[in-house]
């Protein structure tokens, strides 16, 4: 069973309050999502491997640690996931960025992939899928499928707000994928929106309706 990590850091929760607020404008909403993504990236990379090297400081020779060269890629689910990418790249600027686009089939209501652009060395990379919302989990499950069928072996999913239904969907379909969230909300309403949620993340990020 995949693990669920809820980040209750005071800064994350403070910023999340204003992300939820319907009176927060597009510019501030975008900035807050970016900032929370950076804070979450700090936590999600806690287990990155390091190795010891020797350097010369202005005072002496010293042994210290650096990242051991693990390849990492960030994959936003279009379009709202784009709003979280730069926040992660601030901490991991060398990470590659892929993209996965999905639409909902009007008859089956299931997500269908319409776009996928990923680094060439998929099998060698660890992946972090980012999307502000985890509602029904359909898009997340399909995005993970998309990476796995191309050879990805180590995948994490990161979002701002999740509904229990979405968490359950990932755990049932991809028990090897851990989930990192800023808040686990109450439920989905009859329209599939997370309650209390934050509305439509894509519209609020890009100023559309």
From Swiss-Prot:
5-phospho-alpha-D-ribose 1-diphosphate binds at residues 79, 104, 131-139, 200. It catalyses: UMP + diphosphate = 5-phospho-alpha-D-ribose 1-diphosphate + uracil. One of its GO terms (biological process) is UMP salvage. Catalyzes the conversion of uracil and 5-phospho-alpha-D-ribose 1-diphosphate (PRPP) to UMP and diphosphate. Its cofactor is Mg(2+). It comes from the Bacteria. Uracil binds at residues 194, 199-201. The gene is upp. Belongs to the UPRTase family. This is Uracil phosphoribosyltransferase. Its EC number is 2.4.2.9. Pathway: Pyrimidine metabolism; UMP biosynthesis via salvage pathway; UMP from uracil: step 1/1. HAMAP family: Upp_B. Allosterically activated by GTP. GO terms for molecular function: GTP binding; magnesium ion binding; uracil phosphoribosyltransferase activity. Binds 1 Mg(2+) ion per subunit. The magnesium is bound as Mg-PRPP. Pfam families: UPRTase (PF14681). InterPro entries: PRibTrfase_dom, PRTase-like, Upp_B, UPRTase/APRTase, Ura_phspho_trans. Keywords: Allosteric enzyme, Glycosyltransferase, GTP-binding, Magnesium, Nucleotide-binding, Transferase.
């Amino acid at each position: 069973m995949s693990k669920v990590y809820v980040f209750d850091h005071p800064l994350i929760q403070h910023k999340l309050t204003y992300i939820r607020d319907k009176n927060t404008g597009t510019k501030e909403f975008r900035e807050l999502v970016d900032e929370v993504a950076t804070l979450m990236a700090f936590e999600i990379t806690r287990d990155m491997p390091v190795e010891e090297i020797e350097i010369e400081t202005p005072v002496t020779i010293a042994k210290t640690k650096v990242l051991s060269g693990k390849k990492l890629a960030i994959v936003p689910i279009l379009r709202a996931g784009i709003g979280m990418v730069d926040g992660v790249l601030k901490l991991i600027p060398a990470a590659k960025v892929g993209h996965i686009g999905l639409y909902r089939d009007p008859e089956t209501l299931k997500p269908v992939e319409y776009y996928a652009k990923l680094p060439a060395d998929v099998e060698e990379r660890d992946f972090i899928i980012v999307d502000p919302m985890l509602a029904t989990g359909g898009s997340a499950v399909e995005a993970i499928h998309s990476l796995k069928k191309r050879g990805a072996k180590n995948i994490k999913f990161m979002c701002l707000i999740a509904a229990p239904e979405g968490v359950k969907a990932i755990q049932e379909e991809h028990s090897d994928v851990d989930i990192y969230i800023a808040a686990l909300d109450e439920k989905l309403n009859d329209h599939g929106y997370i309650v209390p949620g934050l509305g439509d993340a894509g519209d609020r990020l890009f100023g559309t309706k």
